[in-house]
């Protein structure tokens, strides 16, 4: 398998991921179907971690394996994205506290916010039980936090 370059880049503590809107992402009017914003936000969170130096596979296959579940997701849709739009998913990991991480995200077009999301992701053991973040996760994520962290 060939390693591809990490998608996106950091701008301060924010990770920016470019996303193109394809025909498959839209409804019959050419507007992005609402559920696809959730997919874009997920890509932003995953590529944030990858750009910070750790992927989901690294976390699951480490000596202290873990995974994530979304415990809360609040989305505010502001304006529609349309077919062929070049979007940016902005992701900021705010706080790590206990088993939870607060992540704030936005989808933008030409600097204009189209949607915002507040996500609470929880760390779990591979059997689904809640757990605190691993040392590996803390080592990679804490430098990028924009808010206080109980794990520091």
Residue ranges and their predicted role:
Residues 48-95, 116:
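Hydrophobic beta-strand-centered segment that forms part of the acyl-chain substrate-binding groove
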Residues 2-70, 126-152:
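Hot-dog-fold acyl-thioester-processing enzymes
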Residues 115-117, 132:
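A structural microfeature
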Residues 96-101:
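Short, conserved beta-turn/loop elements at beta-strand boundaries and strand-helix junctions
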Residues 104-106, 121:
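Generic short beta-strand
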Residues 78, 106-108:
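Core beta-strand residues in small-molecule sensory/regulatory alpha/beta domains
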């Amino acid at each position: 398998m060939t390693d591809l370059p990490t998608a996106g880049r950091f701008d301060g503590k924010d990770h920016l991921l470019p996303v193109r809107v394809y025909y498959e992402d839209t409804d019959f009017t050419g507007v992005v179907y609402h559920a696809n914003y959730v997919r874009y936000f997920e890509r932003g969170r995953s590529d944030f971690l990858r750009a910070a130096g750790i992927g989901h596979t690294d976390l699951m296959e480490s000596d202290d394996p873990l995974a994530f579940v979304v415990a809360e997701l609040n989305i505010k849709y502001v304006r529609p994205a349309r077919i062929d739009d070049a979007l940016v998913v902005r992701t900021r990991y705010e706080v790590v506290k206990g088993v939870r991480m607060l992540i704030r995200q936005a989808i933008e077009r030409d600097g204009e916010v189209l949607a915002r999301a507040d996500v609470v992701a929880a760390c779990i053991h591979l059997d689904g039980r809640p757990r605190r973040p691993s040392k590996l996760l803390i080592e990679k994520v804490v430098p990028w936090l924009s808010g206080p962290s109980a794990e520091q």
